[in-house]
Structure formats: structure tokens, C-alpha cells
Swiss-Prot record:
The record marks 102 as: Transition state stabilizer. UDP-alpha-D-glucuronate binds at residues 393, 398, 432-433, 460, 492, 526-535, 613. Its EC number is 2.1.2.13, 1.1.1.305. The keyword Repeat does not apply. It comes from Salmonella dublin (strain CT_02021853). (6R)-10-formyltetrahydrofolate binds at residues 114, 136-140. Pathway: Nucleotide-sugar biosynthesis; UDP-4-deoxy-4-formamido-beta-L-arabinose biosynthesis; UDP-4-deoxy-4-formamido-beta-L-arabinose from UDP-alpha-D-glucuronate: step 1/3; Nucleotide-sugar biosynthesis; UDP-4-deoxy-4-formamido-beta-L-arabinose biosynthesis; UDP-4-deoxy-4-formamido-beta-L-arabinose from UDP-alpha-D-glucuronate: step 3/3; Bacterial outer membrane biogenesis; lipopolysaccharide biosynthesis. The lineage of its organism: Bacteria, Pseudomonadati, Pseudomonadota, Gammaproteobacteria, Enterobacterales. Residues 314-660 are annotated as: Dehydrogenase ArnADH. This is Bifunctional polymyxin resistance protein ArnA. NAD(+) binds at residues 347, 368-369. GO terms for biological process: lipid A biosynthetic process; lipopolysaccharide biosynthetic process; response to antibiotic.
Length: 660
């Protein structure tokens, strides 16, 4: 059986050797060129391939059509991926008749995504493992072929666990590869309800928060110990790294971050103390804890801290227009949780952001973007990243007020885009899933899918075409005048503070809010055209995390990109959403305070929205760009989102009733 292998790291070397030992013919190996900035402590797949006399390649983009054709020429019977860092396109996965298979460093479906080795230690797990699974379009989601468990000892650190996983991988492959070679390939579907996803880790994620439990801090030290970048803290402006530690249960009443003693070197955490066994000051050498204390000039009672605010770059200034809206207020919370962001915002109200008004890094002005143009231009010039989130985005308004939709959603936002061009500021612009219109693709691709809308006499498309035209204008400004931009397309984000029940009372709300209002008031749930339209519902927490990563823009990977942000796994019809909501409503502890359920009522869309409305049957995103550019994957199940959204609205009603 002929194989093409994609491999990197020690796991890649183990995989290549196991495939050879099982009697496969390896036609070619694809790997990565080593990054000079990375600590390459691991084995070289390219060197191993060269020593074995196997053709080896390291293309920048293995999914380019030229390389896909080249791989096809090898005519592989089977494809293996062993710690190859890039996702393989469906075109490549379909080249091998027997299929494509990936070795993942966890017990799937737990710990899908990046850096599972480190994450299991961060989370204090006692067991992990390796899994060989069939590769499908979605990362780490294919049927399981085989897995092997690995116990995590309390003294395991990243490197010792890495060696255990390599050994387990070799044992697993030695056992299953001969069976697969004979055509006997086990397939066990993964349980999506058990799936968890973790993103990439960065060196800065090693910053210690001394207010966490001591076990959490100790687990972080274990998870990123050498040769990984290490867990670190600061004494004044001096950074130091902790390479090994142990837990001491008694913090002696000291405040978190306080030095309890210097020999041994112990630091108080939330519920105990961390003893620093070895560490390193700055770029110095590794020394034992008491010597580290001496080098840093520590004394008992000293307080360790987060990186000083004056340690270099100023904070990143983010301008959010529409800051009081659903996305704006949740994004503000996420940004203010990071020390290096300052938020400037404008909106016509402040009810959703009242909790931030006294925050020292939040600056709010109540105003209208169509009136306060001077304030906006000044702050576009002042800030680093601009998010124009103001838009009319409820379907009934498209047919009620199409001209107002165009004036606000297109004309006012175009003025802001031109300010960004003028002052050369980066803009993160909210496009919409509506731009795909009546696209017939099974999933909507940002770079390939056609954008199809209905006739001119259907004003419901005014929002879609206004957003689409702005997308095209922004793209042209990027191509012709160097505007730095990212377009993101939310797919049916839901969560607390989505809109209001008052908006639902006048028909100007999202679907779930309207459904909740029906339950609260004891009126029939209206299913427009039977409620068979399908959407992919996305938890606001998943959406905001993706949007935050767009703002961070690691490696400038988001520049010039269009990125769908949605959850393809949470596809449901409006009727199914209503049924799930009703079930959650009946189980809610406040259910007894509301009227009986009044049933479902099928309503024709024309009578509800007017003659200018037209609906679409489905709207499912491809999220390959989000995975590739952001290292992001949605993880929150639709039921959890529905329950949390319902709880928010029911408790807000309860508070109002008690107040009256």
C-alpha cells in the first residue's frame, strides 16, 4: 500500500518510522521548514526522510492547486498526518482511496484543536492519550480508528508527558497500521456532545496570576516548562521565569503574590503557596529558588506583580461605534479583561454598558453617528483599531424602513470607512451572513460562494446589498489605497443582552427574543411559513472570542481577509429553536411566574413582514478561514446558549415585576 505522509516534530518521526516498519511504501513526505525563532528541540522529519532516501517537500501552502496536482501524481492509496501543523484541503483528503488519517495528541473528542499536550497539564488532568482518526473537513472531528490512554503523573511536566505520548503513539501505530494495511479500518464516530476545543497557546499565556489557586499556578508551570517558553512573573520591571515548582498548602495569611520566604522561595497564591524550585531572571541562567530570590533582590513581604504599564508599548486604543449594542458591549468586556486595551465608544444609550462606565480604560460618549461626525473623525484619528458596529439589522425593518436602512447601514458607515482610509487606521468591519442571500452552496465560503439576492421589488434585500456594497468598497480601498481591514460575518449570534423584550413587542428584535416574549406574555409562538428555515446559531462567547482574535491579529494573518464566524454544528430550524426554548422554559425555576404556553401558530411571511419580504431556506458557514487565521473553533452547544439567553430575559422580567 502506497502512502503519502504529512509530518513534523518527534511525533512525525515516530509516525514515519512506524509506517515503514508496517511495510507501507512511502511515496513522499511533506513537512515544514524549521522556524529559526522556534526552539527546535525535537527530531527533524526532513533529515529522517533524507536519510531514508524518501522525497521530502516543505511547501508554504500545500493546499495550492499546484501541490494538490503534485500529490495526485504520487497516486497514494492512503494518507497519514503526524503532527503536521496545517489543515489539509478536502481536495487532498479525497486523493487516497483508503482515506486520510491523522494522529492527534489527546483522547478525542476531548481536547480538539491546538496544543493538547500543554492544555491537559494546564487543566490538571490525570489522563490523556493519542488518537488516530479519519480526517474530514472539520479539524479533529472524524471517526476514531484507534486510541491509547496515557496516565499523567503528578510530577509530569510538558517534556516528560511529550515523551510518554510519543511512546504511546508508536505503540498505537505498531498495533493498528498492519491491520489498516489489510483493509480492516475500524471506525467509531465521535460523540459531539463530549467534544471540547482548545486554541493555540502563545508565550505570553505563561503570565502567572497569583490570585489563582496554587494548583492552577503549579499546573501552568508544569505545562510550559522547558523547552517550552515557561511560566513567568515580574518583580517590579524585571521579568523572571519559573521552571519548576511544588505546592505548599499554607499561605500563612499572606496576600496573593506576596513573598512568604526566600529560602525556600515561596509565594502566596489564592489558597496556598507556590515553592519555586528553579527559575531564571531575565535572560540569565537557571538557578535554584533561593538564589533566584537573591538575584531578584526579593525579601519576605515583597509583592510580585503583573507586567508594569510603563514597560514599553502604549495600550491599543479600540474605537467601537455602537458600543451599547449586543456585540459592542460583549466585546468591550472582553477587551477590558486584557490590560493592554483601551476602549473608546459611542452609542445613543448606555444601559448595556453601565457596568463599564467607571472603568478607567473605558471612555464613553452618548451620541449619534449621523450627527457627531467631528467626534468620530477625531477618534478614528486617535485610535488604532476601528469597529463601526452601528446598523439596523432586524428583518422587519428592511421592509418597513428600507431607505433608513440604506442611509445608516451604508452611507453613514461609508463616511467612517473613508476616515479610516484618510488616517490609515485598521478597520474591523461587521459584514453579515445576509450577504450570501439565496446562495445555493451547502456551506457558504467567504472566497468562493456567490452572493445572490432577490428582485428589486423585494426591499428585504436592502440590508444585504448595503452590506455587500460596503464589503466591496472596503476591499477596493484595501487593494488600491492600502486600507488595512478585516471583514467578519456573524452567523446568528445569540446570548444575554441580545436586544430587548420591548423591541420584540414592536416586532423589531431577533428571532429568539420574539419567541421568549411569546412565552413571557402567554401568546402563541408565531412560526413564519412554518418555521422550517434553518440557521446556524452561535454563542456570543464563541463569537466574541473569534472577534477578539481578529483584533489581536497575530502575525497580521487577518489583514485583507473575510472571516465567517458561526457554528456549523448548531444548525436548527426556527421550529426546532422554538421547541428547544419551550423545553428550557418549562424547566426554568421561574416558570411558575409566567402564563401557560399558548401553542404554536403558523403565519405566512407576507402577512408578518409585508409583501417585500423573501426568506432563505438555510444559511450555513464554512469556518475554514477562522480556523486558519484565528486558530478558532466554536465549542458551546446550542442548548447551553438557549438556556443562558432565556435565563437572562426571564430574570430581567422578574426584576421589573418586583420593582413595580
Amino acid at each position: 500500500m502506497k502512502a503519502v505522509i504529512f509530518a513534523y516534530h518527534d511525533m512525525g518521526c515516530q509516525g514515519v518510522q512506524a509506517v515503514l516498519d508496517a511495510g507501507y511504501e512511502i511515496a513522499a513526505i511533506f513537512t515544514h521548514a524549521d522556524n529559526p525563532a522556534e526552539n527546535t528541540f525535537f527530531g527533524s522529519v526532513s533529515r529522517l526522510a533524507a536519510e531514508l532516501g524518501i522525497p521530502v517537500y516543505a511547501p508554504d501552502n500545500v493546499n495550492h492547486p499546484i501541490w494538490v496536482d503534485r500529490i495526485a501524481e504520487f497516486a497514494p492509496d492512503i494518507i497519514f498526518s503526524f503532527y503536521y501543523r496545517n489543515l489539509l484541503s478536502e481536495e487532498i483528503l479525497h486523493l487516497a482511496p483508503a482515506g486520510a488519517f491523522n494522529l492527534h495528541g489527546s483522547l478525542l473528542p476531548a481536547y480538539r484543536g491546538r496544543a493538547p499536550l500543554n492544555w491537559v497539564l494546564v487543566n490538571g488532568e490525570s489522563e490523556t492519550g493519542v488518537t488516530l482518526h479519519r480526517m474530514v473537513k472539520r479539524a479533529d472531528a472524524g471517526e476514531i480508528v484507534a486510541s491509547q490512554r496515557v496516565a499523567i503523573a503528578q510530577d509530569d511536566v510538558a517534556l516528560t508527558l511529550h515523551h510518554k505520548l510519543c511512546q504511546a503513539a508508536r505503540q498505537l501505530l505498531n498495533s493498528i497500521l498492519p491491520t489498516m494495511k489489510c483493509g480492516d479500518i475500524p471506525s467509531v464516530p465521535q460523540r459531539e456532545s463530549d467534544a471540547t476545543y482548545y486554541g493555540r497557546r502563545r508565550p505570553e499565556d505563561g503570565l502567572i496570576d497569583w490570585h489563582k489557586p496554587v494548583s492552577t499556578v503549579h499546573n501552568l508551570v508544569r505545562a510550559v516548562a522547558a523547552p517550552w517558553p515557561g511560566a513567568f512573573s515580574y518583580n517590579g520591571s524585571q521579568k523572571f521565569t519559573i521552571w519548576s515548582s511544588r505546592i505548599c498548602p499554607d499561605a500563612q495569611g499572606a496576600l496573593p503574590g506576596s513573598v512568604i520566604s526566600v529560602s525556600p522561595l515561596r509565594v502566596a497564591c489564592a489558597d496556598g503557596a507556590l515553592e519555586i524550585i528553579t527559575g531564571q531572571a531575565g535572560d540569565g541562567i537557571t538557578v535554584q529558588g533561593s538564589q533566584l530570590a537573591q538575584t531578584l533582590g526579593l525579601v519576605a513581604g515583597a509583592r510580585l506583580n503583573r507586567p508594569p504599564a510603563t514597560s514599553g508599548k502604549r495600550r491599543i486604543r479600540v474605537l467601537i461605534l455602537g458600543v451599547n449594542g449586543f456585540i459592542g458591549n460583549h466585546l468591550t468586556e472582553r477587551l477590558l479583561n486584557e490590560e493592554n486595551y483601551e476602549v473608546y465608544g459611542m452609542d445613543i444609550g448606555s444601559n448595556a454598558i453601565s457596568r463599564f462606565l467607571l472603568h478607567p480604560r473605558f471612555h464613553f460618549v452618548e451620541g449619534d453617528i449621523s450627527i457627531h461626525s467631528e467626534w468620530i473623525e477625531y477618534h478614528v484619528k486617535k485610535c488604532d483599531v476601528v469597529l463601526p458596529l452601528v446598523a439596523i439589522a432586524t428583518p422587519i425593518e428592511y421592509t418597513r424602513n428600507p431607505l433608513r436602512v440604506f442611509e445608516l447601514d451604508f452611507e453613514e458607515n461609508l463616511r467612517i470607512i473613508r476616515y479610516c482610509v484618510k488616517y490609515r487606521k485598521r478597520v474591523v468591519f461587521p459584514s453579515t451572513s445576509e450577504v450570501y442571500g439565496m446562495c445555493t452552496d451547502a456551506s457558504f465560503d467567504e472566497d468562493k460562494s456567490n452572493l445572490i439576492v432577490g428582485p428589486v421589488n423585494k426591499p428585504r434585500w436592502i440590508y444585504s446589498v448595503s452590506k455587500q456594497l460596503l464589503d466591496r468598497v472596503i476591499w477596493a480601498y484595501g487593494e488600491k489605497e492600502g486600507l488595512r481591514f478585516t471583514l467578519f460575518r456573524p452567523f446568528n449570534w445569540m446570548g444575554p443582552r441580545l436586544d430587548s423584550l420591548n423591541a420584540a413587542r414592536i416586532g423589531s428584535s431577533r428571532a429568539i427574543t420574539q419567541l421568549i416574549l411569546n412565552l413571557v406574555e402567554g401568546t402563541p409562538i408565531k412560526l413564519i411559513d412554518g418555521g422550517q428555515q434553518k440557521r446556524c446559531f452561535t454563542d456570543i462567547r464563541d463569537g466574541i472570542e473569534a472577534l477578539f482574535r481578529i483584533i489581536v491579529n497575530e502575525g497580521d494573518r487577518c489583514d485583507g481577509k473575510i472571516i465567517n464566524i458561526g457554528n456549523p454544528d448548531n444548525e436548527a430550524s426556527i421550529q426546532e429553536l422554538a421547541t428547544l426554548l419551550l423545553d428550557s422554559f418549562d424547566k426554568h425555576p421561574l416558570r411558575c411566574h409566567f402564563p401557560p404556553f399558548a401553542g404554536f401558530q403558523v403565519v405566512e411571511s407576507r402577512s408578518y413582514y409585508g409583501k417585500g419580504y423573501q426568506d432563505v431556506a438555510h444559511r450555513k458557514p464554512s469556518i475554514d478561514n477562522a480556523r486558519r487565521c484565528l486558530g478558532w473553533e466554536p465549542s458551546i452547544a446550542m442548548r447551553d446558549t438557549v438556556e443562558e439567553t432565556l435565563d437572562f430575559f426571564l430574570r430581567s422580567v422578574d426584576v421589573a415585576e418586583r420593582a413595580s
